Amino acid sequence: MKCRIVAPEVVDWERLDRFEDRTVFQTREWLQFVSETQDASPVVAEIREGNEIVGYFSGLTFTRFGVKVLGSSFPGWTTPYMGFNLIPGATRSVALAALEEMAWEELNCLHMEVSDPHFAVEDGQALGFTTSAYVSYRTDLRKSEAEIFDGMDSACRRCVRKAEKSGVVIEEAHDPAFADEYYEQLKDVFAKQDLVPTYDLDRVKSLVKHMEPTGRILLVRARDGEGNCIASGIFPGYNKIAEFWGNASFRSSQILRPNELIHWYVMRYWKQRGVEVYDWGGEGTYKEKYGCVPHSVPWFTKSRYQFVSKLRDEAKKMFERKQKFMGWLQTTRNASTRG
């Protein structure tokens, strides 16, 4: 197989969107969202076997500290996976080898990372990639609504019923004010742990701007009996997979259990639109009460030179330290204000 870069102006997005293994994270609008928020350039490449096009690759390139990187996806992008779209019978490990050659020789990258929901761990190991994983949970939406609800533990089902009896209602959002409301609630969630959100308000606004018009994202609010917005959530989806991207609520209203009702609404929404999998957006044992099962997607990384991989690991540690410091600083400021 060979990878050939496709010029942005001639990409046939409708053709790409017809692939059975296509996810929302490979769509044109999602790439535009990542490009805008990460100062990155979208890359779409044909995968050819002889004269036949057997698939496509989607990702982005960016440069940090003089190092050019190919990401599909990359840590910090709030995008769990991208990868390939291939016709039945095409082999992902062979496509990955072709992509690596393109990354080094044509794109002149020094580092690359690829995560694909259809990868097997062996696909990367055989080519010398360092292997980690995007670890999450999944709910099978092919089950009936009754089976999904009965699969939750009894306490979770009681929370859903309590929210309904307390007058909590879920509404779909389509207005610009949604991003601000969601982010205020998100800050409250992180403040509980003396942290600050890992992304800023502008990222949420960019996501809503690019994705809301497509119909491939569900934005929801939970309102209490008095009409106050007490919780919200962001749930992109396309083809077979929907994703829990973000959910936030005010601590003062969590006794009404709006979050459980939101997830129950979201699973039914995407199920009714033919989606087969609800991905719970990463780790968190609290998610197990919904009856979901653990699932991991291989994440492959490789650097052309060893020093680059060390830079990547150190950058990740620096980001984690920054988050803890910013959370401490915010807590200190709040305490000073109250005093």
At which residue positions do the language-model features occur?
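Short catalytic-loop micro-motif centered on adjacent basic/acidic residues
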Residues: 113, 171, 276-279
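A general structural motif
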Residues: 42, 107-111, 275
